[in-house]
Amino acid sequence: MEKEAIIKHLKDNGLYIVKKSDFESLITLSGKAYEDYPLDVYFYGGKYDEEGLKQTVRVNLYSMFDDGIIYADSEELNGFVILLPPGYTGIKTLSFIWNGGFWILYNQGIKAFNRMVNFESFAMNLKKKYTNNEDWYLYNLCVSKEAQGKKIASKLMKPLLNYFKLNKKICYLETNNDPNVPIYEHFGFKVLEKTLVPNSNVPHYAMLFDCK
């Protein structure tokens, strides 16, 4: 299976495949790294909520672990990637609930919950528009604040993108932060569409790395 081939390629290039026992460290890392990220500020009604973000990351990690590939730069966990396979259309409701989604609803309220649900529907529709869900989906690239500027993102991305080049695969991502766009363009992604998250002023860039 291709998932196993990618995992082998990542390991061969010195990357670390994340275990569930690493999740709490990644959650803490994310809570600091995503401070003031525009989409998360929007989710929580205009003010960044670190605990809310950490719980959202927790839900994502547990929901995506079995089907996706979660890997880090090393066992030091300076940065990590969540990569999801072709055919991904969003977190299934049962998985969301089972892995802590009710905490978000209870603690963040129905408005924040609805913003997240509506955003995922919007994002998945845009992904399907450009890839027909045949893409490997780079759901998350996160580097700790302390390790930013130390080429951790390059260490995480280059082996993966080399695999896609060799095997003529497409990789899709989105970002909601203007300064991230040239970083991804440097890695070979191209902007397919720039728009706004519905009912907000948050930018949304759909980007593709296409080797077909």
State where each predicted segment sits.
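Conserved GNAT acetyl-CoA-binding A-motif
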Residues: 134-136, 163-176
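A short beta-loop-alpha structural element at the N-terminal edge
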Residues: 14-28, 36
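Conserved acyl-donor/pantetheine-binding loop and adjacent beta-alpha core of acyl/acetyltransferases
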Residues: 80-142, 198
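Conserved active-site alpha-helix within GNAT-family acetyltransferase domains
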Residues: 154, 166-168, 177-194
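Conserved acetyl-CoA-binding loop-helix of GNAT-fold acetyltransferases
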Residues: 143, 149-162
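Active-site rim helix/loop that mediates acceptor-substrate recognition in acyltransferases
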Residues: 47-69
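Conserved beta-hairpin
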Residues: 66-84
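Conserved beta-strand-loop-alpha-helix junction that forms the acyl-donor binding cleft
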Residues: 139-148, 172-182, 196-202, 209-211
